[in-house]
Amino acid sequence: MNSTRISKLILSLLFLCLVTTGRAQTFPRLLLGGDYPDPSIIREGKDFYMTNSSFNYAPGLLVWHSTDLVNWTPIARALHALDGSVYAPDLVKYKGRYYIYYPAAGANYVVYADNIRGPWSQPVKLDLTGIDPGHVVGEDGKRYLYVDKGAIAPLSDDGLKVTGPKKTVYEGWQFPKEWKTEGNGDMFLEGPKLLHKDGYYYMV
């Protein structure tokens, strides 16, 4: 093999290494460096907004903005004081107002704002036990919150008050008793987030 071919081969290998390295640095990549679990995202046209668990940090419930679901910028803090570990929030928009439902210190709360960038209200405590609240509007036009263990509770029209007792409406898939699992079956019914599309409700 002559020197010209060797030079071309070396240049080709170097180019391949550069392309591979460039791809590795750009995609896939870490979107948010740090501890930002349990994201809840809504879309408004070309804009996406997100919040996540903030646990024992205050101010908490950081609100993020993105136009591509890759690059996120913090724009607000929805929770100004700490009332317990905050986790598994649900960010929703209903009739022009933004709400974040979240559990903390053995209870459920909601904060709200007319502008996603704030100001956000003080926390409103809801008369509802359970964790991981998920907001949904029923076919009857009424508002509800799902919580863990397949339970649901009705909300007032403004979304700031529970108007009736919660009841179990979904018991999940009963896996075989001979399976070895951690804890009881109902402990896996957590984090209900709901979506209504084309006449169907989806729970994830």
What are these regions (language model features)?
Residues A24-V204:
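Carbohydrate-active catalytic/glycan-binding domains of CAZyme proteins
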Residues M1-T26:
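Bacterial Sec-dependent N-terminal signal peptides
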